[in-house]
Amino acid sequence: RHAVAREQRGHRKLPRKLHDPTSTTPPMILIPVIDLMRGQVVRAVRGDRQSYRPIVSTLCEGSDPVVVARALCAHCDSNRLYAADLDALTGGTAQAAVLRRILQAMPELEFWVDAGFADADAAQQLRERIGPEAERVVTIFASESLRSRDELARCFAERDGDRERGVLSLDRRDGQRLDPAGCWELPQLWPSRVIVMTLERVGADAGPDLATLREVQARSPATKLVGAGGIRHAADLDAARDAGAHAWLVASALHDGRLPPVRR
């Protein structure tokens, strides 16, 4: 899985956008993604985690997480990065040392992390393992992982000043919601930012799932939605923006050179 954007805080720069400056439509924010497995970046395809292989990218050599993270953020002119910890998501131990190394190497990074958190306590435990750098971690709470409605409410009740501590990801695969806690039906408990994750579109060159995006938007029109999966080229980003997406999580199209570098 992989996995919306947050406005500028202090001196940190915003991720840049692919956008026509003459347009009055809000620009699309690109959030680059890395999928981490056993200490390296792998290529995600259709959410079939057991078949993932080390990334091969036009942007950099090798699959070292720091090298790949820097290349993606430079290409997107972004200080925001999403990471899916596949070790944790497949029942293993979260890669705290790898996450810490990325944060230490990129001191301006706002790091969105999905490690299959079942509850707020699990997220806090990973923060403690990462150490002081975890102040820059934005926790992703995914509908496929959250265990109860009570935990859904608890995860987004905690705040850091005026900043929400996490983002909700609404997950589905092949038309079926991955949602043991019933998150999809509880928009009153959603945070201000929600990811719409269609797993079979991830790395599949299949186009974005705009129907599901519109379905979620209808449930909560004021929520900032971030799509995930399916982007093939810049025209897909335009269509996603027109459908109401605030941002999109992207990996394969960046590694394959199908999206141009973002410039100021």
Question: What would you call each of these model-derived segments?
Answer:
Residues 3-5:
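Short linear motifs in low-complexity or flexible loops
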Residues 36-53, 121-202:
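Conserved anion-binding
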Residues 48-70:
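Short catalytic helix/loop segments, enriched in acidic residues and glycine
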Residues 72-75, 79-130, 210:
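N-terminal active-site wall of soluble small-molecule enzyme domains
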Residues 92-115, 155-166, 205-227, 231-232:
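Alpha-helix-loop-beta-strand connector modules within alpha/beta enzyme cores
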Residues 111-133, 186, 213-220, 225-247:
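Catalytic cores of alpha/beta
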Residues 132-151, 198-203, 230-236, 243-263:
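Glycine-rich phosphate-binding active-site loops on the catalytic face of alpha/beta enzymes
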